[in-house]
From Swiss-Prot:
Pfam families: RNA_pol_Rpb2_1 (PF04563), RNA_pol_Rpb2_2 (PF04561), RNA_pol_Rpb2_3 (PF04565), RNA_pol_Rpb2_45 (PF10385), RNA_pol_Rpb2_6 (PF00562), RNA_pol_Rpb2_7 (PF04560). Belongs to the RNA polymerase beta chain family. This is DNA-directed RNA polymerase subunit beta. Coiled coil: none annotated. HAMAP family: RNApol_bact_RpoB (MF_01321). The RNAP catalytic core consists of 2 alpha, 1 beta, 1 beta' and 1 omega subunit. When a sigma factor is associated with the core the holoenzyme is formed, which can initiate transcription. The keyword Cell cycle does not apply. The gene is rpoB. The lineage of its organism: Bacteria, Pseudomonadati, Pseudomonadota, Alphaproteobacteria, Candidatus Pelagibacterales. DNA-dependent RNA polymerase catalyzes the transcription of DNA into RNA using the four ribonucleoside triphosphates as substrates. Its EC number is 2.7.7.6.
Length: 1363
């Protein structure tokens, strides 16, 4: 068992029975891979070019209107972003990269006589095309200094879909089938039946036209259409017998059970007598017996349909029977009278082939391709006179031109698989064959030979990730650019122009910026804690442009579908109107190149599980039988059970191992990251698990994070992939460390052109998007060896590289004086005094000094009419000190604004404008601390416009930043020198000096100690008489100089950025941001929750001495209501409590053993045997036994708080395991114990369930919600107080509250509340007067809302007058 750097500090015992064959893929790779494909330029890519390359190729080459010039696209590149992510967040900038394109302008000379073109000139130039937002390493975008996430969108895949109206269109309830071809870009094509079974088509939901018209427009004639879709029989009239002769076809007898009399044409014998029963098998036997031609009576032709046109006279209207005419006695008589002895009949019957297309052809008045195209044109462009040329061009552009129509490679793949076509996925327009195949399918559907598609199947829904969404947006910008380029090409002198002159970069930049700022899918990142970040990046939304809307989405779309298995989590989705529309990707899910979600499976051959892992999409999966991960398997991989529960074609079945094709990779591949963090998920009701996984995202990072004693084993994956921790990028040794940075010397680096040192700057007390605190703490010591990928610093809500959202607290499930009624929570005062649930929140205050009409605002300490006490926290520049304790109303930044002096006359104004005298009067517009909050100033940032003189504070901040960068530079140079000297030692060790250097005499033997004492420049002067060694030293000198120069350049670049002015909004001269840290202790009214959806509100904080306590006197921390468990069916919390209790007791035992050993954390026989009994032999021998002295000491220190365990979802500890753990911890296996009442000292009547539960404090803090209204604003119309904390609103006294007072008969109180306390304007004034005068009488008048009601009734033309 290989332990990582952080795992050695806190080893988890796992209850998982199944070996992990596939580690969880990087949790944010969905975002990163998608955007990488957009921005990576691969010039060697032989296949379809990706990303921006594809975008530019979609419009280039651009030709001018006279064919004199073309602008061609060659390649593109993205420059390095100007500022790094940290600088962008600080300065409020967007993290973008400049997009440069190499374009070639080719100008032609046209020879009018010979009609030829010769190239006159070709100019190539790199042109700036705009700014492209770049993705940070953690999968986010920074727009205007704010971190945003682009959510993946689930939408209907392009392709062809068959469906029916579920019998709703017509009163008869008949199923009307329809089909829709959805392209990625272009017009939609629909085909549908009506009640009379005619087949129609529509383009873009316009008026419907007969489907035969579409086929004729493709170039088929009516008879070719009949031949394509129907087989035919030829009937010829035999005058001798008066019967019709035709070939004997057994197929015709499929639909009939008994038939008319049939005579063998050759012998004249009756082979089938009238009334004989005959079916397909009998008919087949007759054919094999030699029956070839038969004679049938005229009755058997009636009801059949003509396959070809039959002309019986020269009359235009009446003389022709068209294709699809249904035969009857009259028609047959007319045909015979016209001396037509042979006719062709389409083979139709009620089972195999209905005559739907034939009747459609018959009713279609169009007869030629031109007629058909003209009719389509009339529908597309009603009111415009049609000409055949224009109509043909428009029809061809609809579906058959790659400029206007694009199925996309996905659409082509889907269409090929649905219609069984063989066609390259490079062909992304419709072909005639596709439309013909679709009509065939429509006929099959009506005949019951095929089934409609399930639109909620994940094979028919695909995901658009960031890359694709941004690419589509870029395409919009580029199309706008194309129009502008074409205009410029005609107006400019093209021969002297350069590519630069034709390009305006604005449209692309604006288009991309719009998307990131205002699109529904570009969202403000949820940064409450690391889990909420990861979940946000893995979210899949069905809403957004081109998706569904909440109102239209029905139940089916929101429901869990069998294909969600292993792709989309069935548990994690919001409660409320978005339920089921916003989902989360499952743990192992990936998105393939076509945008379909795939899930991994292990191959099974002949009942033996292979190591090979394959990813399957929902379409592929339906072909196979797939077993679940917990099927019993022996060491060799053989499946042991005779019948295994499997999934096959969306159903659950029991299958024989030999028939199984695949097996799940892990039981947790079913659920999302958040759901797989819930231990004993399998014992919780789904609704409560949903609440649990949603509430974990709302947990605020606490002051002292603590990872759960009962975890699921993926806490470390979340902490690692979320990007809040610091991960070592290379192997190395920790060289220097303090609270703000870690310096690691890379051990493997021998190339001095790369830096040999990694400096990791830690984030200290930074503000997150949700005002929670981001703070990183080092986990390493000087001298520690770290490997690439090790976590070297914890971030918010992480402890030792594991996710730590809450706290392990001792819980008792029992009622306590009604204080835990209705899910309320009773908490011990210890949790407040020891800062167990204390969190730090950081609020940003911002003030701007603008240039106004009356003069410039000024940030200063010199504020009129403010006493010195109020300015005690401000420095000489008028800005608050870092570290100052501030409370509500305190000045953070002093600012004065010129006051408009309305009294001054025109003379004064003139003089003032001439002599530039300052505005005489100023008002105090200082930035003050908001009401109801107090805290400590943790950071101040000052931004100055370019060219504005900096104040003292700005210069101080600037110096401090330059000092930090200087320190980094010094450290890098030190480590570089050390590395160079070590390399020099490898070359020169043991050699003797041939020439004196400084204090070293000739002949001195060189070693590392001596080389380290010499100045680095003298090292390069060493001569030892060996040409090769001296050449190596010279090479080393070059490498050193190059590396030192790189360090110097980086330093100068950073200093330049620090010193340069800031880009501020127009008219803003200076901006100051103040960050205040507010400490939030637990208070009654705060919302708390466990991981199982067991949420509640703190009702009372009880002194420790009053809490229930155990036999040894230890009080519990939290008391929950036992009635909250049975009806909610989240029993997982009880199992967690039992197991947590055992873990805690193990910690107590470790503490006891350490105390026995004089409080030394050493490996003694007792500690070793105890740990072996808990962890088991395998884990102890494979991991813990191998730890060195320091590592073992660290482990023991951490284990004193409890031995952590992991119980993976669906593969965790069973009831038996929990009992065994309790036994091992010498605790009652019932999990219950006697408690004593802290107030009386008496024992409670019966044992109580006690243990350790993991509780979270949620981001619904009472301090943010509680408020009181004194006097405040009123609504203008109703004259009632506004609502809500932001408006300083009042408390709503609604309809039901009125009923309550009516029920009590409290009429005076009620009258007061509805009038003078609310919207009786005159009454309010009178009440105020009586209070001022000290009187006690007042009367109520008419409430304003009554007047509003009267006005509304008057607006309905009903006059009301009051007497």
């Amino acid at each position: 068992m290989q332990l990582s750097f952080t795992q050695k500090k806190n080893v988890r015992k796992s209850f998982g029975k199944l070996a992990e064959t596939l580690s969880i893929p990087n949790l944010i790779e969905v975002q990163k891979n998608s955007y990488k494909q957009l921005t990576d330029f691969d010039s060697e890519a032989g296949d379809l070019s990706k990303g921006f390359d594809r975008v530019f190729k979609s419009i280039f080459p651009i030709e001018d209107l006279n064919d004199k010039a073309t602008l061609e696209y060659v390649s593109y590149r993205l420059e390095k972003p100007k500022f790094d992510t940290e600088e962008c967040i600080q300065r409020g900038l967007s993290f973008t990269s400049a997009l440069k394109c190499t374009l070639r302008l080719v100008v032609y000379e046209i020879d009018q006589e010979n009609n030829t073109k010769d190239i006159l000139s070709a100019k190539e130039q790199e042109v700036y095309m705009g700014e492209v937002p770049m993705m940070t390493d953690s999968g986010t975008f920074i727009t205007n200094g704010v971190q945003r996430v682009v959510v993946n969108q689930m939408h209907r895949s392009p392709g062809v879909f068959f469906d029916h109206d579920k019998g709703k269109s017509h009163a008869s309830g008949k199923l009307l089938f329809n089909c829709r071809v959805i392209p990625n870009r272009g017009s939609w094509l629909d085909l549908e039946y009506d009640v009379k079974d005619f087949l129609y088509f529509k383009i873009d939901r316009k008026k419907k036209i007969f489907a035969s018209t579409l086929l004729m427009a493709l170039g088929l004639t009516k008879s070719e259409i009949a031949d394509e879709f129907y087989d035919k029989d030829t009937y010829s009239f035999d005058a001798k017998t008066g019967k019709w002769k035709t070939k004997f076809n057994p197929e015709n007898y499929k639909a009939k059970n008994f038939s008319e009399e049939v005579t063998d044409a050759k012998t004249g014998n009756v082979v089938i007598k009238l009334g004989d029963k005959i079916n397909f098998l009998t008919a087949k036997k007759l054919a094999s017996d030699g029956l070839k031609d038969i004679l049938v009576s005229q009755e058997s032709l009636i009801g059949k349909y003509l396959h070809n046109e039959v002309k019986v006279s020269d009359d235009e209207e009446e003389g022709t029977f068209g294709i699809g005419t249904e035969l009857n006695d009259t028609i047959i008589k007319q045909i015979l009278e016209a001396n037509i002895s042979s006719i062709e009949i389409s083979i139709t019957n009620s089972i195999n082939k209905g005559p739907y297309l034939l009747t459609t052809i018959l009713n279609d008045k169009n007869n030629s391709k031109n007629d058909a195209i003209t009719e389509i044109y009339k529908v597309l462009r009603p009111g415009e006179p049609p000409t055949v040329e224009i109509a043909t061009q428009i029809f061809n552009n609809l579906f058959f031109s790659s400029d206007r129509y694009d199925l996309s490679d996905v659409g082509r793949v889907k269409m090929n698989s649905r219609l069984n076509l063989e066609c390259s996925d490079k062909i992304t327009i419709l072909r005639n064959d596709d439309i013909i195949a679709i009509v065939h399918k429509m006929l099959d559907l009506r005949d019951g030979k095929d089934e409609v598609d399930d639109i909620d199947h994940l094979g028919n829904r695909r995901v658009r990730s960031v890359g694709e969404l941004v690419e589509n947006q870029a395409r919009i910008g580029v199309y706008r650019m194309e129009r502008a380029i074409k205009e410029k090409m005609t107006t400019l002198d093209i021969e002297s122009a350069m590519p630069q002159d034709l390009i305006n970069a604005k449209p692309l930049t604006v288009s991309l910026k719009d998307f990131f700022v205002s699109s529904q899918l570009s969202q403000f990142m949820d940064q409450t804690n690391p889990l909420s970040e990861i979940t946000h990046k893995r979210r899949v939304s069905a809403l957004g442009p081109g998706g569904l809307t909440r109102e239209r989405a029905g139940f089916e779309v929101r429901d869990v579908h069998p294909t969600h298995y292993g792709r989309i989590c069935p548990i994690e989705t919001p409660e409320g109107p978005n339920i089921g529309l916003i989902n989360s990707l499952s743990t192992y899910a990936k998105i393939n190149k076509y945008g379909f979600i795939e899930s991994p499976y292990k191959k099974v051959l002949n009942g033996i599980v292979q190591d090979k892992v394959e990813y399957l999409s929902a379409m592929e999966e339906t072909k196979y039988t797939i077993a679940q991960a917990n099927a019993k398997i022996d060491k060799s991989g053989k499946i042991l059970e005779e019948l295994v529960p499997c999934r096959e074609n969306l159903n659950f079945v029991l299958s024989n191992p030999s028939k199984i094709d695949y097996i799940d990779v892990s039981p947790k591949q079913l659920v999302s990251v958040a759901a797989s963090l819930i231990p004993f998920l399998e014992n919780d009701d789904a609704n409560r698990a949903l609440m649990g996984s949603n509430m974990m995202r709302q947990a605020v990072p606490l002051l002292k994070p603590e990872s759960p004693l009962v975890g699921t084993g993926i806490e470390s994956d979340v902490a690692l992939d979320s990007g809040v921790t610091i991960v070592a990028s290379r192997d190395g040794t920790v060289d220097k460390i303090d609270g703000k940075r870690i310096v690691i010397k890379a051990t493997e680096e021998t190339d001095f052109t790369k830096s040999g040192v990694d400096i990791y700057n830690l984030q200290k007390f930074k503000r997150s998007n949700q005002n929670t605190c981001i703070n990183q703490k080092p986990l390493v010591r000087v001298g520690d060896k770290v490997k690439s990928g090790d976590i070297i610093a914890d971030g918010p809500s992480t402890k030792l590289g594991e996710l730590a959202l809450g706290k392990n607290v001792t819980v008792a499930f029992m009622p306590w004086q009604g204080y835990n009624f209705e899910d309320s929570i009773l908490i011990s005062e210890r949790c407040v005094t020891d800062d167990v649930f204390t969190s730090v929140h950081i609020v940003e205050y911002e003030v701007m000094a603008r240039d106004t009409k009356l003069g410039e605002e000024e940030i200063t300490r010199d504020i009129p009419n403010v006493n010195e006490e109020a300015l005690k926290n401000l420095d000489e520049s008028g800005i608050v000190y870092i570290g100052a304790e501030v409370k509500a109303g305190d000045i953070l930044v002093g600012k004065v604004t010129p006051k408009g002096d309305s009294a001054s006359g025109p003379e004064e104004k003139l003089l003032r404008s001439i002599f530039g005298e300052k505005a005489i009067d100023v008002t105090d517009t200082s930035l003050k601390m908001s009401r109801g909050s107090s805290g400590t100033v943790v950071d101040v940032r000052v931004f100055n416009r370019h060219g504005i003189e900096k104040d003292e504070r700005s210069i101080t901040i600037e110096r401090a930043e330059i000092d930090t960068v200087q320190q980094d530079k010094i450290v890098e140079e030190e480590i570089l020198e050390r590395s160079i000297k070590q390399r020099a030692n490898q070359i020169l060790s043991g050699a003797s000096l041939t020439k004196k250097i400084k204090d070293l005499d000739e002949g001195t033997k060189l070693d590392l100690e001596i080389i380290n004492k010499i100045n680095i420049n003298d090292v390069f002067k060493i001569t030892v008489g060996n040409v090769n060694d001296e050449a190596s030293i010279a090479q080393l000198k070059d490498q050193y100089n190059q590396a030192k120069q790189d360090i110097q350049e980086r330093f100068e670049d950073k200093v330049l950025k620090i010193r340069s002015g800031d880009d501020l909004l127009p008219s803003v001269m200076k901006m100051v941001k103040v960050f205040v840290a507010i400490k939030r202790r637990l208070r009654p009214g705060d919302k708390m929750s466990g991981r199982h959806g067991n949420k509640g509100v703190v009702s009372k904080i009880v002194p420790v001495e009053d809490m229930p306590y155990r036999e040894d006197g230890r009080p519990v921390d939290i008391v929950l209501n036992p009635l909250g468990v049975p009806s909610r069916m989240n029993v997982g919390q009880i199992l967690e409590t039992h197991l947590g209790w055992a873990c805690k007791e193990f910690g107590e035992e470790v503490k006891r053993l350490v105390n026995e050993n004089n409080k030394k954390f050493e490996k003694t026989e007792k500690i070793s045997s105890f740990l072996k009994s808990v962890y088991g032999k395998e884990v102890f021998d494979g991991g813990i036994e191998k730890l060195n002295k320091t590592e073992f000491s660290d482990l023991c220190e951490n284990l004193q708080n409890g031995i952590a365990i992991s119980t993976p979802v669906f593969d965790g500890a069973k009831e038996k395991d929990v009992s065994e753990m309790l036994e091992l911890a010498k605790l009652p296996t019932s999990g219950q114990t006697n408690l004593w009442d802290g107030r009386t000292g008496e024992m409670f009547d019966r044992p109580v369930t006690v243990g350790i539960i993991y509780m979270l404090k949620l981001h619904h803090l009472v301090e943010d919600k509680i408020h009181a209204r004194s006097t405040g604003p009123y609504s203008l119309v109703t004259q009632q107080p506004l609502g809500g904390k932001a408006q300083l609103g009042g408390q709503r006294f609604g309809e039901m509250e009125v009923w309550a007072l009516e029920a009590y008969g409290a009429s005076y109180t009620l009258q007061e509340i509805l009038t003078v306390k609310s919207d009786d304007v005159a009454g309010r004034v009178k009440v105020y007067e009586t209070i001022v005068k000290g009187e006690e009488n007042f009367e109520s008048g008419i409430p304003e809302s009554f007047n509003v009601l009267v006005k509304e009734i008057k607006s309905l033309a009903l006059n009301i007058e009051l007497n």
